[in-house]
């Protein structure tokens, strides 16, 4: 029972609960980050050591901050936004703390990457610089103001590779194992195993899974 004679007690207890909850998640965050570092080391032929990946790769810096910010997002959204903006300022990689990102995630190079609030990214996904996972449009309320807290960003399933400069917009699904080529503009879902490639004159889709 909280006493009215001690108005500070309630926020103190809330803060203690948040800190304890966060501390309890640190082992799982560490496991996720181990997988992210391993994905970067194994996914980049220019990486010569795990130490190099940890110390030199902006994508790793950004995902470390994101894993922490995402864990805090539900309870302390302002703090999580501050954390994500520190990473954004340092790396040029803008990941909203609300985005859900699976294990083994690798951002190579990274400058200009944008990942929106309601994105859902599966496991072992690799993306390159200047990729945008954003909203196709912003919905409005009856009074003309922008709606808040609605789903508007892509789902990227497991084992997808998205090359530099690709723009993927709206609540669409990029099927498992797909490859999205550089500079592709995509606003529709694609099946598992698709290759979406951009030629100088046209964009074309190839599905490399039988059936």
List the model feature ranges, each with a label.
Residues 1-85, 209-211:
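Terminal amphipathic alpha-helical/low-complexity segments used for targeting or macromolecular assembly
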């Amino acid at each position: 029972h909280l006493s009215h004679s001690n108005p500070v007690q309630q926020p103190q207890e809330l803060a203690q609960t948040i800190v304890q909850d966060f501390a309890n998640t640190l082992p799982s965050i560490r496991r996720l980050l181990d997988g992210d570092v391993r994905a970067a080391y194994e996914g980049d032929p220019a990486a010569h050591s795990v130490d190099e990946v940890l110390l030199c790769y902006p994508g790793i810096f950004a995902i470390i901050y994101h894993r922490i910010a995402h864990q805090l997002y539900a309870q302390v959204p302002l703090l999580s936004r501050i954390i994500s903006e520190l990473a954004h300022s340092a790396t040029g990689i803008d990941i909203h703390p609300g985005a859900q990102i699976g294990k083994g995630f690798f951002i190579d190079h990274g400058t200009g990457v944008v990942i929106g609030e309601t994105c859902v990214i599966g496991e072992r996904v690799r993306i390159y610089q200047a990729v945008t996972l954003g909203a196709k449009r912003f919905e409005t309320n009856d009074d003309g103001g922008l709606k808040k807290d609605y789903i508007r960003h892509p789902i990227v399933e497991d084992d997808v590779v998205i090359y530099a400069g690709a723009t993927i917009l709206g609540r669409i699904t990029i099927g498992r194992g797909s490859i999205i080529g550089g500079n592709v503009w995509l606003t529709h879902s694609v099946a598992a195993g698709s290759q979406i490639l951009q030629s100088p004159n046209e964009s074309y889709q190839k599905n490399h899974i039988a059936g």
